[in-house]
Amino acid sequence: GVFELEVANSLAGGELTFRRSPLFGLPYPAGSEILLEGTLDPMELASEGPFFDLLKTYDAVRAQPVLTVQRAHHRPGPLFHYIMPGGMEHQILMGLPREAKIREFVGNVVPSVRGVYLTPGGGTWLHAVVSIEKQRDGDAKNAMLAAFSAHPSLKHVVVVDPDVEVTDGRQVEWAIATRFRADRGLLIVPGAAGSTLDPSALSDGETTKMGIDATYPIREAEKYKRVDYQS
């Protein structure tokens, strides 16, 4: 597996220092405000919730392992940093690693991936926009399937050409309006495993996924060119 403290240290330029916890001797960042030491028994479960989650809807009550805290340590006047559910910080922590994974998986089936964006409107979880440079018209559908494989919770994905900025919702909508035709570019995947956070899914997360090919046909590129002007 990946040791998360090593990743954090790399992101911090190797400047983090670590100490060993008094009770268990496990490493922790030396500048921590609060340190909790305890045990997590996977067989001891308790109901958690309901509370609102990433999608700003109430999540189902779930049975989760119980943490038994044995010692608590803190600095004088410690600061407790709280991440608000559904807020931008929560969305970045959840979505950013998935964007990287989607880019990796799509890159395995399409020669050139230009951009991947999990949209804020989809909670940076359910909706993605992927920009590719097609070599053949089937590349867009392969990109959709790869995106769904990379991020199983993904519900809808739109594939666009490199001239469409994935982070600009107006441009993405324009691509759907002018380049998408449902009889040739719509992919429906019924009975797929999705996100249990999605209130429209079944209790086990089963849902129907949708892919939209908003790229233009390669042999008709001239017809679909966007005029570059500023009003």
Q: Could you say what each language-model-derived stretch is?
A:
Residues 1-231:
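Charged, compositionally biased interaction regions
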